[in-house]
Design a protein with these regions (language model features):
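Alpha-helical transmembrane segments and their helix-start/interface "positive-inside/aromatic belt" motifs
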Residues: 1-10
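Interfacial/capping segments of alpha-helical transmembrane domains
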Residues: 12, 16-44
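Small-polar-interrupted transmembrane alpha-helices in polytopic inner-membrane proteins
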Residues: 15, 70, 85-108
Length: 242
């Protein structure tokens, strides 16, 4: 997870610096239509108006399905020895870097964080973790260790699948946040209708989401390992015999 996070942050940084040095980079990554729409919304005093378009439930279904699809592609990218997984991280990293730069360049950086990262904290973290699952699968193929390659592959595939399945509820919650909560928060910065959520609500959601990701996927596994626990083939947590 640490390796995947560092690589993803590197790709995001490349996206930011590329946007800073090439005005057309943002349009090339996000598309002219999206950039033009965002600039029109900013000019109208409703910079995050895109999150108010459409039926919330329809958005919830589509966003949830799309995010799970991206995660699944990152997972099966492990069958390509991690190359396709890396490609997905590259594309999403550049997109995120260009996307955030667009708002910071308009003086809307902090506001964009308070609105977009309500759902983005869980969504982006889950995609990075899904990529980690892809690399676990690739590692089982490339580095069998003392196991036969077929056995190593099966072990890697099983571990990676468990990680991927654990992400499904997170993607569902992220889709709910984007469709309903981000929808409300976007109204906070609508000059014509600033009846959205208070800033403190956004900060609380961001903090809780980030704390959950760090605790469940980083701290908790480390603590289990230090206490001598391990995960059985059937997924049950057990303790090593002393």
């Amino acid at each position: 997870f640490l390796f995947t996070s560092v690589v993803f942050i590197l790709f995001v940084t490349i996206g930011v610096f590329s946007s800073m040095n090439n005005e057309e980079f943002v349009r090339g990554v996000l598309g002219d239509g999206y950039v033009d729409m965002t600039e029109e919304n900013i000019a109208k005093g409703d910079p995050f108006g895109v999150y108010k378009d459409g039926n919330p439930f329809s958005m919830f279904v589509w966003i949830g399905f799309n995010n799970i699809s991206v995660a699944f592609k990152a997972f099966i990218g492990g069958f390509t020895l991690g190359l396709f997984t890396m490609w997905i991280m590259w594309g999403n990293g550049l997109m995120l870097g260009a996307f955030q730069f667009m708002f910071f360049a308009k003086g809307l950086g902090i506001k964009s964080v308070l609105v977009i990262w309500i759902h983005g904290t869980l969504e982006i973290s889950a995609i990075v973790i899904a990529a980690t699952a892809g690399f676990i699968l690739a590692s089982g193929i490339l580095f069998p260790g003392t196991y036969a390659r077929s056995v190593s592959f099966k072990r890697g595939a099983k571990d990676a699948a468990k990680v991927l399945i654990s992400l499904v509820p997170i993607f569902i919650v992220a889709a709910f946040f984007e469709s309903y909560i981000t929808h409300l928060m976007s109204q906070t910065y609508d000059k014509a209708n600033n009846t959205g959520l208070p800033v403190w609500a956004s900060v609380c959601i961001l903090s809780v989401s980030l704390t959950f990701i760090i605790w469940y996927f980083v701290i908790y596994p480390i603590r289990l390992h230090k206490k001598g626990y391990y995960i059985q083939p059937d997924g049950i947590i057990n303790r090593l015999k002393k």
